[in-house]
Amino acid sequence: MIEADRLIAADNPTFREEDVIDRAIRPKKLDDYQGQDHVRSQMEIFIKAAQMREEALDHLLIFGPPGLGKTTLANIVANEMGVNIRTTSGPVLEKAGDLAALLTNLEENDILFIDEIHRLSPMVEEVLYPAMEDYQLDIMIGEGPAARSIKIDLPPFTLIGATTRAGSLTSPLRDRFGIVQRLEYYKVEDLQHIVQRSADCLNLSMESEGALEVARRARGTPRIANRLLRRVRDYAEVMSDGNISSEIADKALNMLDVDVRGFDYMDRKLLLAIMEKFDGGPVGLDNIAAAIGEERDTIEDVIEPYLIQQGYLQRTPRGRIVSDRAYLHFGIDKPDK
């Protein structure tokens, strides 16, 4: 598989080496999909049932933090169903005609995957409702008094929507998904299997303890685990004999400024800012964003979820508060209040 990808990359300079590697290590079947056991077992049943009835799979909404494999799961569903998948994202679909063009080109039981579906415009969303429910498009032709509505029948299809913000979806859209799956942060042992599988796909020499070291610092996120693996590979090839042991992985990750808890520079910057500038909180999100020079959405969607899940940060009605665990991690005395 990777050799074919390398040939494609050689012919097309727009392909980056990182993209080629991503495609090579991405699982194609549910059997290769590590972790998320509840999602995998449910999807196996739903897919088999749809195949037995020779129907399109019910519309599927996948939500969870970034990097947990929403796009990967959508492609796996397409492979398991044996159908084509067309991929787009919410911000790209600016007009109703953009969505109509995609829908009218679908074949029976095909999949339309919309990433960041919470960012669909209301106009485009209105077109989706009859398409999802009745497999019909309602299109307005002409303008003013001469305008008329025509209905276009669509083949049965599956819409897969992915979002990091399920709460931002409108109720009418959310209610039209027959299957809703939430992806959780991965356990360390599941990430270790993912790292080891990726290393095998890339023909890397990697010890199990080396894979464990990478997995422990990957913030429960496969995308981060695979990114760290590529950088550890670089370090091992330049500074050693290419074999990735626990010691080599530790040195490489320390060089990358990723600590034993998986915190990177921005994680530490956020926690330290709350502790040192705001006496541990509570402090509002706007103040944190100004203090660390980061966007609100990035803090809320990318940085905070893992810190909260690990018990280092709390969201309260009055603002963000760091926990005692954060003070212990940094060796800082908690101020008396």
Swiss-Prot record:
Stored CDD domains: AAA (cd00009)
GO CC term, one of those recorded: cytoplasm
Subcellular location: Cytoplasm
Region (Small ATPAse domain (RuvB-S)): 187-257
Keyword Zinc: no
Chain spans, region Large ATPase domain (RuvB-L): 4-186
Binding site for Mg(2+): T71
Keywords of this entry: ATP-binding, Cytoplasm, DNA damage, DNA recombination, DNA repair, DNA-binding, Hydrolase, Nucleotide-binding
First-tier enzyme category under EC: hydrolase
PANTHER family xrefs: HOLLIDAY JUNCTION BRANCH MIGRATION COMPLEX SUBUNIT RUVB, PTHR42848
Family as reported in the entry's similarity comment: Belongs to the RuvB family.
Entry comment, domain topic: Has 3 domains, the large (RuvB-L) and small ATPase (RuvB-S) domains and the C-terminal head (RuvB-H) domain. The head domain binds DNA, while the ATPase domains jointly bind ATP, ADP or are empty depending on the state of the subunit in the translocation cycle. During a single DNA translocation step the structure of each domain remains the same, but their relative positions change.
Its biological purpose: The RuvA-RuvB-RuvC complex processes Holliday junction (HJ) DNA during genetic recombination and DNA repair, while the RuvA-RuvB complex plays an important role in the rescue of blocked DNA replication forks via replication fork reversal (RFR). RuvA specifically binds to HJ cruciform DNA, conferring on it an open structure. The RuvB hexamer acts as an ATP-dependent pump, pulling dsDNA into and through the RuvAB complex. RuvB forms 2 homohexamers on either side of HJ DNA bound by 1 or 2 RuvA tetramers; 4 subunits per hexamer contact DNA at a time.
Name under which the protein is recorded: Holliday junction branch migration complex subunit RuvB
Protein source organism: Aliivibrio fischeri (strain ATCC 700601 / ES114)
Gene field: ruvB
